[in-house]
Amino acid sequence: MKKILITGGAGFIGSHVVRRFVNKYSEYQIINLDALTYAGNLENIKDIENKSNYTFIKGDIVDETFINELFSQHNFDGVLHLAAESHVDRSIEDPLAFVKTNVIGTMNLLNAARKQWKDNSEGKRFYHISTDEVYGSLGAEGLFTEATPYDPNSPYSASKASSDHFVRAYGETYGLPYVLTNCSNNYGSYHFPEKLIPLFINNIINNKPLPVYGDGNYTRDWLFVEDHAIAIDLVFHEGKNHETYNIGGFNEWKNIDLVKLLCQIMDQKLGREQGTSESLITYVKDRPGHDLRYAIDASKINRELGWKPSVTFKEGLEKTINWYLNNEEWLQSVTSGSYKDYYQKQYS
């Protein structure tokens, strides 16, 4: 039985990946390692907690001693590394926390995997999941490709760029078998409401202001999280060693247009008069170092592995909104306590 370590598996993207692997690969033993910080929640994976091929371990990848002990207790055939601090606003407020988790934490995992696989790396794989933000900001035209030079502009993207470089360096220097992917903005269920779509869904439900940075004309490419999980599965099993794949949704939206679409759908779902939610839009001071546009060229993964998004944005957004409306208890539980303090500080 193969033993696979998935880090950050109680988070947003990680929980979808863990669920897919546990349900699809009964011959794998899945170890889910998560520190259960504010964005990690065991409720996200409650439906699989009693599966015989699943084990949860609470721990922090920043703790080198803990990681070394974990690898001494388990012989892993693969590592899917999703654990990360990922919110740009929080990185501006506390960049060192992002360095610790995203850089030092990744280093600890790389070192442990290198030592464990030193004498036999056949069939092993370290899969590092990263972001399109490492490429910086696009102009009005063009797409990020796997050959686009790195040009990070926020502490978050700088920390992820650093971790990407270390993964590749370990591949070149030590022969560590790795694959790496850079993805566009994800959306879907179990997404902590600090990112645009879940934040605004939650605010509309509660008749709170919808804070839009600057003029709202920043453009992002949106990818349904379940499509991303399928791509991760495919890259882990069929991707070529030492290769990078971009994963995108082929789905660009200006922030303000997306917000207005959300408002229209939510008014309809909640039985409110059209325009009610849109009246909540509030333009706020722009974020420092705000990248104008991200857009992914995902032709490589399509060409080499046959992946493309299967869920349209309309379908995905409908599923996402319905999930949040049907899981208000989950929303209330994750938006209590420290979340309220952070929100007040960030958007007041």
Model-derived features: positions:
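Residue-level detector of secondary-structure boundary/capping sites
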Residues: 157-158, 191, 253, 292
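A glycine/serine/threonine-rich, flexible loop-to-helix segment
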Residues: 48, 142, 193-201, 262
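C-terminal substrate-binding subdomain of Rossmann-fold SDR/epimerase-dehydratase oxidoreductases
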Residues: 4, 17, 30, 37, ...
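Short secondary-structure boundary micro-motifs
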Residues: 81-82, 186, 194-195, 277-279, ...
